[in-house]
């Protein structure tokens, strides 16, 4: 009777208080938007960045040199992608134990700021050119830049980017301006700079020359014309009195025509069209006749090679205007003339094209400088003088003044419209023209007189340096190589006010610029004291000293191309802070910087030092919306990073960045970020589980690794494999792979497998009779502790806020997780044989799980614990499964292994009773609610 009462009491008892359930105050709901600023404040208070510098002093240094964003406006999603990617790389390199300083910087000179400041003066009814002196204007530009530097600094810090924010580099700092001017002097002293009049890309809106890096291309519709030039003289009698036909997409250049070009090896024909004779390339005759609307016969009167046209002379269609227009137009042989389009004869205006300029120069034909800096022909020009902008569609239209005048004299044969790509200013978006103006250039193909690359050219030095740099992705090398091979000399002068001046004095008699180190030293000393404003307010005689008279020298009024500014950052940031000769390990920017910062930095460093300023270059793509479209406010598909941060937190943005294949263009939308948030929640919940599961864990509880059960050893094997793969991903900057590997390990190997199997041990292998738990439970928690230390570090470079939150939750007095180094993962944990064995076990477990699931849905079994499975396997698989408790691994009541040739897999509901504490269905449980042997043991029953 007493035994019966004891059994009844056992069954009736509530065993829940004896079961360990993971408990933690770590919130499931992240609340990142509120939590992250608190963590930022902690980092600021503890000066985490400086702690790292002190801790890593003497360690291997890794310099990721920051390409300067422009100090104008709030940050956009492209900025966020760039800065977060940089921070992930720097934090991961820091995790490897390296000293990774980060000096953020800003590009502060240039047109966008000038425009904004000009607007401010206009609102005050002031004319910038007449009412404001250069120094006053520059000071206002400086104030404007300071405002946006301060604004963007706070926005970048909110992304979690760690750096020397209190001491950034600015291209407008006095020391920076002095060093930029000093870099220019290196080029001038070695004879690499020259002044020349040649066609450069010119913005009539901004009234300045632009470099290739400042040019965007957009499709436009242009008026094209077929135009006849009368041939007045030739050694081929048939040609005299006939007409050479040219085709052009720029009618506005005709008023400056100086010659006609032919291809020496091209076949030409003179044809009779209704009594008039016209010269075309034979290969383009059919297309040309269609364009001018000729449908009848076209008898060939003469056929010959272009070389035979040498010495022929034509007259300008507007020759009756006299003067310039009455001068003869010679035929010139040009290798650039092809039969790809047009007529095979090209009109030459040396003011408005590189090929035109070079061919005419070779024949002593000079440009005429007919178009002013505002894009209008000079008022004294005999045709089109003082009329509208040459880029105006009205000027170039078929019914515009140029075409109308040419039609009136009978020279215009046809007009049409061509849809094609055309250069535009990347800032104003206005169409550009080629315009011949006096500019300052850095020569690419002139052998250097002295210095680091004496006897070599800048182009050959740069191309050699490209081969010595690591490019990520590899295609970046081909891209910049092609650009450097084909680019013209670098035009470094700008006709503006806000920038570093070209600190040269030109001899008024010889035209040579002064190369005197003493003069240069005085200039640089003044710049260090009062900035580049010194050039604009100086008594230049003080700079020249006693050796030279100001009346003999003209100070240059142009400023430097801003790309020379940013191209010099390796000098005034990297070398200035870390020692002369120091090179950055990495430059990282968008793919457009192959023609921008990567290239200007390469040319500047190669010209002054003979090598690239970087060891490796990594590029990322542009940000597009979820459908692959460019973001546009008018379309309404812009993602504002600040809004995302305020709603979801910076860690969501950081995880999105890491998840992308940023070597290509990347997509972002609300839907994309929603998917990122789902992935984040899974990782966060796994950390929450670890914190709860490790509650109360102590060193005394640890089990020697040699004594771990096989499953735990297998998990450590997977961890060792993961560790190696993550390390490789860091070194290859492959963070999308890094995040995928980390997420897959946590979600698939841990949450869905290891944690699932071992939750019974965690919950139920501890009690009053076993306060520290069984050996198996302690082994599990030992591995959980190893996993925690590894995973929180692995996550830290990407989820910098969440990793800190997790770490401090468990170790509130341990300092920042970002002060720790890469986890110590023993390579001996790798066990290929064990890995192969457990791959088989997991494969069979998956088969069992998939077979049970339909029965759970149909409520034939309530959970897998109620299932008995008959599993047919071959002998080799049976041996593997028999070596482990496969029922425990499948979380089932029982697994019966049978020969593979027998029946198919079956699942039945077990007849075993359910333990009242652990809920397992086991043979020793006498009836539902009674305890199994294990539970009796740990609770002391």
Swiss-Prot record:
* UniProt cofactor(s): Zn(2+)
Say which family it is in: Belongs to the class-I aminoacyl-tRNA synthetase family. IleS type 1 subfamily.
Residues noted as binding L-isoleucyl-5'-AMP in the record, renumbered to the chain: 589
**Where does it primarily localize?**
cytoplasm
Cofactor-binding details, from the entry: Binds 1 zinc ion per subunit.
Q: Which CDD domains match?
A: Anticodon_Ia_Ile_BEm
Q: Which PANTHER family match?
A: ISOLEUCINE--TRNA LIGASE, MITOCHONDRIAL (PTHR42765:SF1), SOLEUCYL-TRNA SYNTHETASE (PTHR42765)
One annotated GO biological process: isoleucyl-tRNA aminoacylation
The record lists ATP as bound by 633
Q: What is the lineage of its organism?
A: Bacteria, Pseudomonadati, Pseudomonadota, Alphaproteobacteria, Sphingomonadales
Q: What is this protein called?
A: Isoleucine--tRNA ligase
State any GO CC term: cytosol
Q: Which reaction does it catalyse?
A: tRNA(Ile) + L-isoleucine + ATP = L-isoleucyl-tRNA(Ile) + AMP + diphosphate
Q: What does this protein do?
A: Catalyzes the attachment of isoleucine to tRNA(Ile). As IleRS can inadvertently accommodate and process structurally similar amino acids such as valine, to avoid such errors it has two additional distinct tRNA(Ile)-dependent editing activities. One activity is designated as 'pretransfer' editing and involves the hydrolysis of activated Val-AMP. The other activity is designated 'posttransfer' editing and involves deacylation of mischarged Val-tRNA(Ile).
| GO MF, one annotated term | zinc ion binding
Print the keywords alphabetically: Aminoacyl-tRNA synthetase, ATP-binding, Cytoplasm, Ligase, Metal-binding, Nucleotide-binding, Protein biosynthesis, Zinc
């Amino acid at each position: 009777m007493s035994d019966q009462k004891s059994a009844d009491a056992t069954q009736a008892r509530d065993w829940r208080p004896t079961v360990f359930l993971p408990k933690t105050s770590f919130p499931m709901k992240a609340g990142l938007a509120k939590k992250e600023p608190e963590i930022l404040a902690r980092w600021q208070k503890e000066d985490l960045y400086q702690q790292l510098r002190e801790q890593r002093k003497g360690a291997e240094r890794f310099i990721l040199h920051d390409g300067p964003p422009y100090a104008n406006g709030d940050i956009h999603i492209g900025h966020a992608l760039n800065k977060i990617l940089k921070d992930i790389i720097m934090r991961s390199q820091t995790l490897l134990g390296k000293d990774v300083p980060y000096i953020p910087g800003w590009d502060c000179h240039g047109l966008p700021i000038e425009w904004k400041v000009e607007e401010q003066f206009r609102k005050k009814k002031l004319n910038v050119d007449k009412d404001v002196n250069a120094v006053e204007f520059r000071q206002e530009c400086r104030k404007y830049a300071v405002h946006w530097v301060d604004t963007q600094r706070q926005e970048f810090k909110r992304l979690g980017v760690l750096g020397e924010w209190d001491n950034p580099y600015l291209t407008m700092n006095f020391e920076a301006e002095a060093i930029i001017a000093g870099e220019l002097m290196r080029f001038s002293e070695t004879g690499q700079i020259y002044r020349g009049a040649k066609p450069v890309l010119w913005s009539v809106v901004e009234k300045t020359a632009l470099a290739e890096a400042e040019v965007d291309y957009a499709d436009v519709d242009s008026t094209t014309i077929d135009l006849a030039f009368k041939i007045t003289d030739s050694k081929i009698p048939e040609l005299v009195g006939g007409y050479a036909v040219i085709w052009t997409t720029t009618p506005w250049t005709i008023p400056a025509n100086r010659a006609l070009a032919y291809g020496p090896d091209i076949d030409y024909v003179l044809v009779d069209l209704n009594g008039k004779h016209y010269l075309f390339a034979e290969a383009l005759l059919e297309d040309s006749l269609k364009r001018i609307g000729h449908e009848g016969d076209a008898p060939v009167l003469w056929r010959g090679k272009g070389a035979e046209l040498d010495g022929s002379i034509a007259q300008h269609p507007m020759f009756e205007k006299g003067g310039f227009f009455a001068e003869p137009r010679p035929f010139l042989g040009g290798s650039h003339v092809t039969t790809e389009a047009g007529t095979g004869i090209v009109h030459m205006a040396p003011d408005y094209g590189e090929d035109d300029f070079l061919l005419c120069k070779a024949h002593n034909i000079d440009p005429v400088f007919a178009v002013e800096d505002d894009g209008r022909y000079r008022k004294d020009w005999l045709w089109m003088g003082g009329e509208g902008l040459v880029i105006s569609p009205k000027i170039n239209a078929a019914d515009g003044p140029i075409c109308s005048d040419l039609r009136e004299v009978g020279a215009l044969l046809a007009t049409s419209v061509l849809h094609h790509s055309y250069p535009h200013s990347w800032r104003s978006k206005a169409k550009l023209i080629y315009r011949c103006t006096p500019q300052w250039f850095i020569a690419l193909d002139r052998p250097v007189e002295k210095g680091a690359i004496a006897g070599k050219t800048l182009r050959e030095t740069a191309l050699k340096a490209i081969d010595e740099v690591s490019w990520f992705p590899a295609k970046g090398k081909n891209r910049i190589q092609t650009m450097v091979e084909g680019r013209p000399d670098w035009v470094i002068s700008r006709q503006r006010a806000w920038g570093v001046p070209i600190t040269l004095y030109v001899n008024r008699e010889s035209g040579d610029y002064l190369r005197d180190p003493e003069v240069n030293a005085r200039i640089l000393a003044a710049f260090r004291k009062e900035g580049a404003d010194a050039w604009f307010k100086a008594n230049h005689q003080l700079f020249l000293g006693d050796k030279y008279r100001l009346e003999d020298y003209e100070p240059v009024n142009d400023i430097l191309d801003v790309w020379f500014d940013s191209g010099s950052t390796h000098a005034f940031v990297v070398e200035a802070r870390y020692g002369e000769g120091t090179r950055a390990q990495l430059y990282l920017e968008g793919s457009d910087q192959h023609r921008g910062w990567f290239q200007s930095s390469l040319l500047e460093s190669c010209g002054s030092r003979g090598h690239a300023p970087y060891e490796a270059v990594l590029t990322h793509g542009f940000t597009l919306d979820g459908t692959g479209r460019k973001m546009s406010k008018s379309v309404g598909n812009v993602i504002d990073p600040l809004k995302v941060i305020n709603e979801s937190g910076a860690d969501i943005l950081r995880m999105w960045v890491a998840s992308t294949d940023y070597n290509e263009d990347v997509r972002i939308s609300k839907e994309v970020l929603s998917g990122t948030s789902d992935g984040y929640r899974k990782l966060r919940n796994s950390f929450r589980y670890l914190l709860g599961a490790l509650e109360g864990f102590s060193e005394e509880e640890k089990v020697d690794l040699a004594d771990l059960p096989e499953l735990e050893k297998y998990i450590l094997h997977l961890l060792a494999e993961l560790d190696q793969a993550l390390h490789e991903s860091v070194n290859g900057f492959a963070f999308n792979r890094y995040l995928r590997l980390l997420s897959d390990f946590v979600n698939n190997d841990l949450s869905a497998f290891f944690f699932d199997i071992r939750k019974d041990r965690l919950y139920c292998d501890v009690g009053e009779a076993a306060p520290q738990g069984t050996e198996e439970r302690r082994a599990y928690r030992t591995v959980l502790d190893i996993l925690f230390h590894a995973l929180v570090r692995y996550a830290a470079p990407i989820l910098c806020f969440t990793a800190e939150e997790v770490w401090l939750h468990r170790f509130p007095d341990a300092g920042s997780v970002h002060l720790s180094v890469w986890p110590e993962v023993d390579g001996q944990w790798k066990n290929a044989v064990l890995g192969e064995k457990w791959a088989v076990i997991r494969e069979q477990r998956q088969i069992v799980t998939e077979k049970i699931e339909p029965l759970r849905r149909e409520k034939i079994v309530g959970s897998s614990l109620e299932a008995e499975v008959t599993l047919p396997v071959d002998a080799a698989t049976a041996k593997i499964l028999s070596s482990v408790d496969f029922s425990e691994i499948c979380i089932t009541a029982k697994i019966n292994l049978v020969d593979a040739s027998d029946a198919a897999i079956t699942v039945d509901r077990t007849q075993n009773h359910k333990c009242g504490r652990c809920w397992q269905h086991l043979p020793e449980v006498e009836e539902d609610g009674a305890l199994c042997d294990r539970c009796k043991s740990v609770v002391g029953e």
